[in-house]
Amino acid sequence: MVSQNAPFSLMYDAWKAGSRALLPLDENTAREQVKEMCAKVLSNRKPPYSLKGGLYDALVATGGDMFLATNEEAMEAGALFEKLEGIDIEPAAAVALASLMQCVREGRVEKDAVIMLNITGGGIGRYKKEFNPMRQKPDLVFPVNPDPEMVKTKVRELIGK
């Protein structure tokens, strides 16, 4: 099972269309969609989906499926996890949990099924409230489609080689 956070649904759209190739998505539209989603770490515009041995192949080989969760569904799932487990989770984990909850509601999970769900970021929200960490600016920011040679040069400069 792989989950994406609506409205950024690049892999989900390709999977549901039965396409190994990602469907075209305008860069400006993609940027706007990423701004709207709560789990920004799930916004890879060039994910390892289409390549041989990538997510498409893994889902086909395992009979898997792709799911989509809204921000609201993710927030509800995250709040439920915190209420029941006593710890906050990151938005990406909440998206995965929302997708699992969707599967349960739809009867796609057997009653006695053994489930492993990777929950990340437990306690980060609490930590931020208690310690108020300062956000650092990146030393290096690349354009959307950088020249590979420019990337090599900039990284070498950054690490001093």
Indicate residue ranges for each PLM-predicted region.
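Catalytic phosphate/nucleotide-handling subdomain of diverse soluble enzymes
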Residues: 97-160
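Short glycine/serine/threonine-rich phosphate/pyrophosphate-binding segments
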Residues: 1, 10-11, 92-100
